Amino acid sequence: MVYSYTEKKRIRKDFGKRPQVLDVPYLLSIQLDSFQKFIEQDPEGQYGLEAAFRSVFPIQSYSGNSELQYVSYRLGEPVFDVQECQIRGVTYSAPLRVKLRLVIYEREAPEGTVKDIKEQEVYMGEIPLMTDNGTFVINGTERVIVSQLHRSPGVFFDSDKGKTHSSGKVLYNARIIPYRGSWLDFEFDLKDNLFVRIDRRRKLPATIILRALNYTTEQILDLFFEKVVFEIRDNKLQMELIPERLRGETASFDIEANGKVYVEKGRRITARHIRQLEKDDIKHIEVPVEYIAGKVVSKDYVDESTGELICAANMELSLDLLAKLSQSGHKRIETLFTNDLDHGPYISETVRVDPTNDRLSALVEIYRMMRPGEPPTREAAESLFENLFFSEDRYDLSAVGRMKFNRSLLRDEIEGSGILSKDDIIDVMKKLIDIRNGKGEVDDIDHLGNRRIRSVGEMAENQFRVGLVRVERAVKERLSLGDLDTLMPQDMINAKPISAAVKEFFGSSQLSQFMDQNNPLSEITHKRRISALGPGGLTRERAGFEVRDVHPTHYGRVCPIETPEGPNIGLINSLSVYAQTNEYGFLETPYRRVVDGVVTDEIHYLSAIEEGNYVIAQANSNLDDEGHFVEDLVTCRSKGESSLFSRDQVDYMDVSTQQVVSVGASLIPFLEHDDANRALMGANMQRQAVPTLRADKPLVGTGMERAVAVDSGVTAVAKRGGTVQYVDASRIVIKVNEDEMYPGEAGIDIYNLTKYTRSNQNTCINQMPCVSLGEPVERGDVLADGPSTDLGELALGQNMRVAFMPWNGYNFEDSILVSERVVQEDRFTTIHIQELACVSRDTKLGPEEITADIPNVGEAALSKLDESGIVYIGAEVTGGDILVGKVTPKGETQLTPEEKLLRAIFGEKASDVKDSSLRVPNGVSGTVIDVQVFTRDGVEKDKRALEIEEMQLKQAKKDLSEELQILEAGLFSRIRAVLVSGGVEAEKLDKLPRDRWLELGLTDEEKQNQLEQLAEQYDELKHEFEKKLEAKRRKITQGDDLAPGVLKIVKVYLAVKRRIQPGDKMAGRHGNKGVISKINPIEDMPYDENGTPVDIVLNPLGVPSRMNIGQILETHLGMAAKGIGDKINAMLKQQQEVAKLREFIQRAYDLGADVRQKVDLSTFSDDEVLRLAENLRKGMPIATPVFDGAKEAEIKELLKLGDLPTSGQITLFDGRTGEQFERPVTVGYMYMLKLNHLVDDKMHARSTGSYSLVTQQPLGGKAQFGGQRFGEMEVWALEAYGAAYTLQEMLTVKSDDVNGRTKMYKNIVDGNHQMEPGMPESFNVLLKEIRSLGINIELEDE
């Protein structure tokens, strides 16, 4: 296997057995591809902005003598880059400019004669752009648009499963759901009549819609029924016989023909009878006259002599009618064929309850139902019905909807019109009737073939279209009103509605969410999340059990494990590792094709619908070297069921064992040994891990760590291969390889790293280089680690030495006992950065001012501020300290004579302003690491703002000139090469100053051309530098675009280091979470025979009942990994020769039964082996992929190689007494995470604070600085103890007795510790409530 330079530094031993046929795809492609589709120009006009424009334009005036046509659009360049947008708190977006053409036609001239054409580019608002990592920066914060899983447009057949009515009768229904437009439902009622609803309104008989489509009763019956023909011959009644129709009936008369009796009266007609009738080719049989009574005629019968209607279509025949028909010469009578078994008379019955009889009455009925209370006119009724389903403006099935519609009705073509046709409606009714007749099945709406993914691009396009439609109305008005000769396209378009619609979607849609930025995994998972909630989706309250449950079609598409606990369970899911969406938005998953029993490496992506037709083998089926299945019977999935199939029947095979799960779950080693509930918690808690100060790769991983770290975008990844030319903490410079350069460029790539910035969750984002000078790199290599990554691998926590044993009750109920060593080594120390902002506004009484001159504040409080009133960088501040001094003008108040006197003597200033400074919130402390000042255009900048500006300018200039130097050096080395090869002597050349080199001329014409080209490039480079510097300078010095009424914003960033402490929440990766109960001195911790103490003691009782055995296997394997690291460490310390080291490491990598990983250390240089060994000293990292992990025997082998007991248990001694514990204890290395539930953020105390307005009781919660609720049960407890005075105190002066509590405060001040309880305010509230019910209630003072 070929390793890149970064991977060679530390190779993870892989226990996976199954070959990797398909690499893990780019994990953010669902976001990036979707948005790309939205903004890139699509010549077909199927997707994105292009589709939205084409669907709305051309806009015609009402008179039709002018129209506004769309030509093309382009997106401009964003004003600020992503970082600048985040700092300034603005949206990262690009201006949309659209070329429109106004065409004016001649009025009097014939149709289509053009009078005038004006073309112009019009600004249509800003479109937020996606960053490279799949996020949007909206108002300075990173947000993610979550994909939505919604019901696909199309037609669905369903039933109520017998729940609607007490009789338990199953009522079937059909629903046509368009992408946009009105829903059309058909449903049966108890009496088997068919009804229709439009947009879930009042139901009408279904035949109304057919009449509105201009069908007569005869035509309606013709569409839905087969006919039975009776003929009257020689006063006898003959019936045309179709034998198949008789099956299962009981003969009500002898069936005979040609003198032979086929079925006797009262006998059941069987298949044998039918065969005989068919064999003898019987076409007619004689039936008794009574047989026709009760049959329904299929058309109108008129007496031709008089023109009188004898019987109308859909009338029941009686013997009288039969006689009349016979007399008037109708010898052939057509009736409807119905029976109770599979040809129900539903439509015929429905026609009877239908009150309408022609098209107009049907349209009026529909109009009345849609617009109750409005008087219907013919035109209004017609246009309403036309617009409902047959107008492209109002109704669109979309390509997906049409495809699903046609598939559902078993039609061959999958393309068609976006609106409904007559045939569509009739075919849906026919299929519904077939289902009611017992032919066909209802659909399963939870099947992933019936639910599709709506991603960012599509949702943004819909919002954009909404904005355009609003503009369309305005444009139509303008075209009709204005003087067209002077109008230009830009006078008609108002960009406000468009940008408002887009802004609203990105800013406040339920699916536009504040990005979860705890760590790289939480970012990736958030972008791959799939929600069934949101506009057009489900709501939590209404979603039942079925929607939330795991469906067989989720396999390989949606993760069955990763979903939140709580009310959203099952509604918010995560995309599986290999899943992607197809052109229609349905999820598909890859499979290996199986041809003639041989598994090939050909990969097909199948959607849930396609998958149903195949037999698919599991990824862990055993194959021989040729790719044949070893066993005769293979476990496969087919049609949603798992069972055994013979190997010849298999069509496809899974690509990978981790195909089923999401990225989060695929990072849990030994997932296959964990109970599903705990695996769910494990997958969810990894997302809450806080990045530690020093990331530490997991000793036991799954091999997915690298993919997540690289794809998440938190690391710096090489765009092209080359060598490291320069590296420091904030930038890396790569000299690009010759073969990867574009012609005529300097061949230098510069990577600027992010330093100590704040994430959305207040954790710290910081990148650190992990390459050194002169090192070669390849494209895709990790150059710098971000938060929670270690040498390009995801590293969410720390490897801790754990023991499973009780320890003095300190690990009761999942508590965790931690050694002091963990605190000393800063293993779980995290940095948190908080942003505090102070806004200075323009008030009615005058502007607020940022200043150090604050009334009534002592010197000490101002000691950390500079003369502008802003805190110094580096100041250590605690709760209540002033960060930014600010005063607000105070209204003129009535002054007492004394105050007037004081003001007269001491001047004005002190009392007409009040202190409104920004202070550090209670319970927060830290160091000021950055201050930013934003000043409105036209407001004078203060000293601090100018200092910051100067510093930024200096920094920008320094960065750019360094960049220029690096690029220049690259260019000049190429110029030198050309000159030397052109015959200039190297020594003489080096004596010349570099600027003069370009003046030299070469005789070789080709070389001279090259030189001139390089000279041009040099000029261009300098010009570019000037331009960049000027742009930077303009950006830094220009005023900021602040919200209306805001003059200045000062942002202060506080950083705080948080060590681990009792009350912090920790967890493993298997759902084993707990709270730290005690930090124990190192000397008291249990230790082993070598005197090594354990770091963490966990409760063994947390394992059996929770059934997450994965943590035990992880602990054993971690022990083995560490053991091998210890042996390598010992060899390095003894300075053994490289050959021995190489041999031992090779042995470790080769261990395990037929593993897929082949590491050949003989191809590594000695330096590379030494570097590898150096990185393996702390333990050899191991990958045990999900469902394909290390087996027990392999763990034991590895333990043996590390000279450790194969039981995984060792003897421990008590740190306090030195006595041996009575039995061996499981000790090993587990990867522990510190979760973002820190005691510092939760602990809180109140003495006095704010009170609720109505009840006057203290508020609750830390945010409101609230108190602890003394609830109902606590009151019972005090009652039970008989502690009456304590209880009285709790319910009065400590809660809502307003007078009592002020009195008590005064008493305490006076040193008199008495209390006088009064009436609680909430009792008064109760009195008022009762009075409001009309019951007078008064307290009598006795």
UniProtKB/Swiss-Prot annotation:
Transmembrane segments: none
Keyword DNA-binding: no
GO molecular function: DNA binding; DNA-directed RNA polymerase activity; ribonucleoside binding
InterPro entries: DNA-dir_RNA_pol_bsu_ext_1_sf, DNA-dir_RNA_pol_bsu_external_1, DNA-dir_RNA_pol_su2, DNA-dir_RNAP_su2_dom, DNA-dir_RNAP_su2_hyb_sf, RNA_pol_bsu_bac, RNA_pol_bsu_CS, RNA_pol_bsu_protrusion
EC number(s) recorded for this UniProt protein: 2.7.7.6
Biological process, per Gene Ontology: DNA-templated transcription
A GO CC term attached to the entry: DNA-directed RNA polymerase complex
EC top class, as a word: transferase
Highest taxon, organism lineage: Bacteria
Recorded catalytic activity of this chain's protein: RNA(n) + a ribonucleoside 5'-triphosphate = RNA(n+1) + diphosphate
Presence of keyword Transferase: yes
PROSITE patterns linked to this entry: RNA_POL_BETA
Pfam families associated with the record: RNA_pol_Rpb2_1 (PF04563), RNA_pol_Rpb2_2 (PF04561), RNA_pol_Rpb2_3 (PF04565), RNA_pol_Rpb2_45 (PF10385), RNA_pol_Rpb2_6 (PF00562), RNA_pol_Rpb2_7 (PF04560)
Swiss-Prot/TrEMBL keywords: DNA-directed RNA polymerase, Nucleotidyltransferase, Transcription, Transferase
Function: DNA-dependent RNA polymerase catalyzes the transcription of DNA into RNA using the four ribonucleoside triphosphates as substrates.
Binding partners and assembly: The RNAP catalytic core consists of 2 alpha, 1 beta, 1 beta' and 1 omega subunit. When a sigma factor is associated with the core the holoenzyme is formed, which can initiate transcription.
Family: Belongs to the RNA polymerase beta chain family.
Protein name in UniProt: DNA-directed RNA polymerase subunit beta
Species per Swiss-Prot/TrEMBL record: Salmonella choleraesuis (strain SC-B67)
Gene name for this UniProt entry: rpoB
